């Protein structure tokens, strides 16, 4: 598309953000407790983006902030079990839209 912002840009950004959140959860589970600097190094993500994702994940109750660093909460396992199903629902919905 030429000129202006594509109406799809925000969708792509949200999908990218969701992927970052999921990656951050996986690394946190594997290396917990883990701090912002280490998460930034491991994931290759700027610290400000790590802080943002941690804030969102904490708000959703998926991680817990401790003095030693972030740790996953009891909700982690259930959330990760639901990820494939939720992604499949998105794919089905996108396929439906593309056929209309």
Segments the model singles out, each with a brief description of its role:
Residues 68-75:
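Minor-groove-contacting beta-hairpin "wing" of winged helix-turn-helix DNA-binding domains
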């Amino acid at each position: 598309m030429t000129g202006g912002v594509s109406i799809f840009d925000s969708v792509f950004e949200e999908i990218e953000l969701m992927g970052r959140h999921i990656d951050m959860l996986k690394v946190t589970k594997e290396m917990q407790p883990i701090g912002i600097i280490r998460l930034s190094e491991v994931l290759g993500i700027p610290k400000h983006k790590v802080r943002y994702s941690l804030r969102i994940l904490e708000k959703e109750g998926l991680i817990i902030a401790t003095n030693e660093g972030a740790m996953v909460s009891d909700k982690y396992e259930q959330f990760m079990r639901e990820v494939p199903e939720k992604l499949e629902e998105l794919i089905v919905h996108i396929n439906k839209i593309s056929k209309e």
